[in-house]
Amino acid sequence: MSARATRPRSRRGRHPLPGELDPVAESSEEVDTTNGSFETKPELLQEHLGPSLQGPGNRIKEDCDVGSHGVLPLSPEERREPEVEAHQALQEAPLDTGPAEITAPNVYETLKCRLSSLEAVVAAWRRHSLSFSKPVEAEDRDPGAPGSFGNEEEASGPGQQEAAHFIERNAWLRLALGTREEELARTQASLQDAQAENETLQRQVQELEDSLMQLEASPPPSMLRAGRRNSNSSSSGAERRPWAPQDSPMAHPFLQRLRSDSSTQSFGCLSTQRPSPEMYLMEDQMGQLQGNIEKLKCFNRLLLAVLQGYKGRCESLSIKLGKREAEATALHLALQYSKDCEEVYEVLLALKTAGLGAGVGATNGDLQAAEKEASRLLVKKEVAMDVKTPQPSPEGSSVDKPTPEELAAQLHGYVQHLRERWALLKIPPVLDPATAPKPTMPHAEATVQTILEIQPGPTLPQLEKSQIQQDLAATRDGLADLVLRLQLAQREKRGLELREAALRAQGPALRLLLQQLRWEQAHLMGDGSSGGSSEDPSSEEEAGEDRQQHYQGPPALLGGQMGKVWDSETVSQELSASLTRAVDLRAQLQSLRRQLEQMAQKGRTRGAQSAELNRELCKAHSALALAFREAHRKQEEQCRKLEQQMARMQAQQAEELAVLTATARALGDPGAPQPVQTFL
């Protein structure tokens, strides 16, 4: 039986020999070494180096002769060489007792060093295993050698047993090497994944940098200061990448992962450490808050724009309001002028009616009342006409009382003055539906909400109290807008009412003017038809018929061409006569106007003279009053002086009398004067 048959083909299902290694335990040790927990202990190395370092009691007796197989036994020094080399190779391998702390940039170099150390160990074991595999192959090629079928214990010497152990260990090492190669492939795959993830993160960081630059360029600096206040303060002292933003709150979660994992990566765990859920939640909240800040800033800008629009709207409304007030003032003045014209026309009508009635033979009471009313009106409107109306002179004066024609002329002048004032006014036109006031702009809240719904981005935060306040402010703005519109409508209504009143006042005035013109025309036509013949008592009836013919037109005569020619000749004669009378009346009117102007000038001159005389009289009166007061004052002063002199003289006389009385008593003269007597 050969030595190959005596070697175990498999270690499954049996316990290993005392001097052998368990492949399952070795594979588990290799796995621990792969995960970074491999420890180079002297006991494991002693166990890996085989039974040559164990005691002699653990060795199996070998009965076969080594020299018959052509295999020389190895000396202990030769057997120890591969063990020492393997031990040196394992010591040269950078296996640490703890997890290797490597950074992300030198992962590939660390893996390369580990791989080179493993290759050195495998090469050392392979070199020594080849030296022991040659005697075994010679034994396999010579199965019929003497003593091959002898006793197994005698045929297997110590060298063959060592060779078998090393061959089996070589197989185990090859298995471990395959495992290490698979792990290396997985490590390379994970390294490639890490590199791909790094590239992805770099792209994301570049995109974040671009977006950050856009955000820094578009919003005001206050947003950046707010972002710095919201940024994570714990990472202020940490080392930052050159491409990472300094204080931006928009930092991507992958950046924090890279920062946190750059100093904690190890050989056994190459994937980056994921942040905690609290970090994710905080980052999401920061992103939401930043979006809300941006949306609120946009909302603020929109509100400012709407506020500017409303300011312009208010200014335009104030301008329109001033314009409406000016138009209302103009309408008030126009209404007042219309009322004055109506009053003047009523007085003129009363004068004309009274004059016509007086010509027919009526009483003069109506005429006097009309003249009195006209005088009162002229006195009342004297300031508006800028003309001083001559007042009726008292009895005994040389100024005559104004005639009805003069009063009518003055009233016509006042009407002309009112018309000139009317022409100076600027009456607003009637408002058409096209020029009606347009409704105000849409509310700011609806406008801003519409714009915000169109714009992309995070929605506004759900505000409760602030939203209610905004709604309240919007309601107040709407109420103020409605009140302003109501005021404008009321002013427009008042303007329309004033315009309607002015038109109503103009109607009767125009009717009165038309009646007056018709009356004048009828009067002129009546004077022309009468022809100055007053001896026929039926002249009044003929004048009435002429007036009726004037209103109704010339009668149509039946007949031929002669009737028509006679009618046309009659009408032409009447027209020429009426024109002549009109010219005469105009000349008379002009002469009357000139006389009126002369009388007015005389009246003004006399008024000026009387005013001058009054001023002179006042001056003389004041001078006389002053002289009287001065004389009275002087008289009083003289009286007071005389009274004082009399008092002094009485006192002096009393003193002299007392002295004389005393002297007389002292002398005892019987012929002394009496006390009532005085001596001068």
Swiss-Prot record:
One of its GO terms (molecular function) is PDZ domain binding. Signal peptide: none annotated. Residues 1-101, 135-162, 217-250, 524-562 are annotated as: Disordered. Residues 1-15 have a biased composition (Basic residues). Belongs to the MCC family. Interacts via its C-terminus with the first PDZ domain of USH1C. This is Harmonin-binding protein USHBP1.
